[in-house]
């Protein structure tokens, strides 16, 4: 080291060698040290990256959604955690045909989900009934006749990339919501399901059906004889001869 350098110059050389960026200086500006936000933005920011879907797949559209679980698409990066119980889910993905007999079960699952909750109608069969509604009287022609739908995803079936696009659009909707205006969209009434209570009723098996004409035993004289059998006496006489 050059002995002609002053101690101050030597100190500056050492600081520049050990820490080229220099010592960080804390600014006194308020905007550089405090994050200002609203309660709506903070609440929505926490929810839009933690959507927990309930997968309600009934037909071939669900196969495309199952492809998202693999490593090629990896839907976990969006914070999607599939749930098997509606009480821990806030997103209902309906994929496939919904029949009249299945409609009360779907509505009951939707009612068991806590607020706020969202619904994605995936596929043509879910949105309009699809090809199964052409000749069938039991297919529901649009799941929005049963439950409110937040996002429609057309296709037969939709590609996994389209499902990603639907999730991104739903995240934008969640990010623009307001806590004060949420009561306008909350569910205030039940849909087509009734109270699931067990009531004691009288037995319907009273035996009256046995008195019907169709339940009576047909006599042997009224039965149609297919083959005329010979009498037993005739058989014995032929054996003796």
UniProtKB/Swiss-Prot annotation:
Binds 1 [4Fe-4S] cluster. One of its GO terms (biological process) is photosynthesis, light reaction. Its main location: membrane. It is found in: Cellular thylakoid membrane. Residues 220-241 are annotated as: Disordered. It is an enzyme of class 7 (translocase). It is a peripheral membrane protein. Gene3D superfamilies: 3.40.50.12280. InterPro entries: NADH_UbQ_OxRdtase-like_20kDa, NADH_UQ_OxRdtase_20Kd_su. The keyword Thylakoid applies. One of its GO terms (molecular function) is iron ion binding. Its EC number is 7.1.1.-. It catalyses: a plastoquinone + NADH + (n+1) H(+)(in) = a plastoquinol + NAD(+) + n H(+)(out); a plastoquinone + NADPH + (n+1) H(+)(in) = a plastoquinol + NADP(+) + n H(+)(out). The keyword Endoplasmic reticulum does not apply. It holds the Pfam family Oxidored_q6. Keywords: 4Fe-4S, Iron, Iron-sulfur, Membrane, Metal-binding, NAD, NADP, Plastoquinone, Quinone, Thylakoid, Translocase, Transport. One of its GO terms (cellular component) is plasma membrane-derived thylakoid membrane. Disulfide bonds: none annotated. Residues 222-241 have a biased composition (Basic and acidic residues). Coiled coil: none annotated. NCBIfam families: nuoB_fam (TIGR01957), PRK06411.1 (NF005012). HAMAP family: NDH1_NuoB (MF_01356). NDH-1 can be composed of about 15 different subunits; different subcomplexes with different compositions have been identified which probably have different functions. Belongs to the complex I 20 kDa subunit family. NDH-1 shuttles electrons from an unknown electron donor, via FMN and iron-sulfur (Fe-S) centers, to quinones in the respiratory and/or the photosynthetic chain. The immediate electron acceptor for the enzyme in this species is believed to be plastoquinone. Couples the redox reaction to proton translocation, and thus conserves the redox energy in a proton gradient. Cyanobacterial NDH-1 also plays a role in inorganic carbon-concentration. This is NAD(P)H-quinone oxidoreductase subunit K. The gene is ndhK.
């Amino acid at each position: 080291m050059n002995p002609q350098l002053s101690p101050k110059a030597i100190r500056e050389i050492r600081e520049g060698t050990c820490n080229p960026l220099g010592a960080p200086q804390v600014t006194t500006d308020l905007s550089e040290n405090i994050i200002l936000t609203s309660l709506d933005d903070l609440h929505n920011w926490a929810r839009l990256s933690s959507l927990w879907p309930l997968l309600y797949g009934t037909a071939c559209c669900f196969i495309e959604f199952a492809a998202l679980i693999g490593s090629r698409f990896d839907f976990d990066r969006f914070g999607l955690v599939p749930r098997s119980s509606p009480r821990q889910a806030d997103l209902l993905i309906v994929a496939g045909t919904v029949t009249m007999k299945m409609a009360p079960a779907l509505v009951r699952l939707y009612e068991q989900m806590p607020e706020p909750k969202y619904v994605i109608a995936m596929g043509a069969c879910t949105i309009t009934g699809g090809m199964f509604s052409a000749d069938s009287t039991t297919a529901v022609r649009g799941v929005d006749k049963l439950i409110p739908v937040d996002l429609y995803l057309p296709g037969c079936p939709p590609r996994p990339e389209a499902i990603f696009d639907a999730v991104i659009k739903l995240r934008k909707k969640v990010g623009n919501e307001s806590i004060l205006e949420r009561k306008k969209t909350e569910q205030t009434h039940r849909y087509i399901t009734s109270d699931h209570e067990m009531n004691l009723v009288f037995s319907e098996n009273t035996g009256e059906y046995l008195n019907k004409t169709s339940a009576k035993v047909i006599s042997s004289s009224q039965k149609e004889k297919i083959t005329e059998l010979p009498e037993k006496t005739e058989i014995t006489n032929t054996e003796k001869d």
